[in-house]
Amino acid sequence: MIRTVLHKNRNYNLPNKQEYEKWERLQILGTFAGTIAGISGIKIYPKKNHPFTFVSVKHKTRIIKFKSDIMKTLIQHQHANVIPFPYDRSCITTGIVHIGVGNFHRAHEEYYTNQLLSDPSQQKWGICGIALLAGDKSLYSALKQQDNLYTLTVCGRDNRDIAYEIGSLKELIWGMENPDAVIHKIAHPEIKIITLTITEGGYNIDKASGNFILETPAVQHDLKNPDTPQTVFGFVAAGLRKRMKAHQGPITILSCDNLQHNGNTARKAFCSFIAAQDSELADWVNTNVTFPNSMVDRITPAVTPADIERLNRHNGVEDAAPVYCEDFIQWVIEDNFIAGRPDWEKVGVEFTTDVSAYENMKLSLLNASHSMLAYPAFLAGYRKVDDAVHDKRFARYLQQFMDTDITPYVPAPGHTDLTQYKQTLLERFGNRSVSDQLSRLCSDGASKIPVYIMPNLIQMIRDKADLRRVSFFTAAYRHYLKYQQDDKGNIYEVNDPWLTETDWIQIREENPLAFLALSPFKSTPLQRDEGFVTNYLQLVSALKEKGVVEVLETILQ
């Protein structure tokens, strides 16, 4: 039996009556002896091999781990600088499965849900995280050893950071360790929503045709072996099949990835896979599964070992899986949930009948600006977004891109002030506390460019608009991929897994025009536009001869 004691908005899980009485005695002692270990600033977690373990707190300049026997010790300590979750976690049940438990999910959906669970009427909406990839093992192991709890540090633009203890991730399953548990969980009657962060390229959609790619080896394996899936499509299909056969009711699949019309993309991917595998299930999905579109926004950097040390030192805890993010957050969702949903609007989520205008604004301004900045800034020797944006040349370049190139194609949604939105973007990019990595923005360009850059570039070409900045971006992307050395002589590795072997042949071609046939550009024949080609060829040569900064200065004139 776990007793939960609420003290100064903190929850203490005490395993038995003896420990509960010990806690009460320490409360009395605390009146006379000051701060007692285990009373203030300490969170107790039940663990498999320990009666309980405490989150560490900072004691002067060193970190102390508290074990159960130290409750008898009187010490002076500063409180851990973390706001605990404001609910009894033992009362939370799981109503959401999330596939792809990365940093963004833990800073975004979990953040909203963690707040919402303080409402007793919403406590059926805890989250079960599902990891499916081999690379997920380290994060899975780190979270499991601390009962899926972690700290989220929100970094303010005013240099004030606030750390939260996140308790909404009630369960965590690693598909490579227990695939049957994944299928069973998706089929469970209490699960009403499957949310996804599987990256822009994870939906396996051909960029040119817009069709789901059935021919990949992993997809072919899952089509032929429905009971032993390897892909997200196979796992979801297996779970839905089990759900259908057990008559466990409808369910919503909600994409939280940076894709325009991400719900439509998710529907295309999953329904195409299921139609190729199981016609009966395909019919069931058509009437029992909805795919709302959504727009998500919160800059969440990759976490390095140095970040872990820094965050834990600042927060006074020992967290093996901390995450940090900016203070801006937004989530806009089409209200199309067939099996019910959390009242996320109580904690700031916006619901609408059509998310398109919000998607277009965010993808065209924020995400496109990230890509426009990433390659030239990295080639100039910068490694962090905030450092690059504090270079007035790059800030001006982004401002011109947003104002001149993009704003004509972005109608403001709702009551949004686009001028203020763009100013806020530059402030967010320059947030010194976040220090997002340019390498993260450079990665996976082949799946980002068709979504963030190409839709507006196509319109710009049709309108015979000024193409200098997008030509500069294209030339910088080629230089980044082809030479893999920045202007300061630093060698780097490229992480762009969606580039094909044919793409790499074209990248290595000495003729720069071959690059314009790359798969990310297939939605429009760039080679046919004389103005774009002229600008692009001039900039390719200039980047090689003069370097990014000197070329950028000519563009800004």
State each model region's role.
Residues G30, G34, G38-G41:
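Residue-identity detector for glycine
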Residues L6, Y12-L14, L29, P46, ...:
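Short hydrophobic targeting helices and cationic amphipathic motifs
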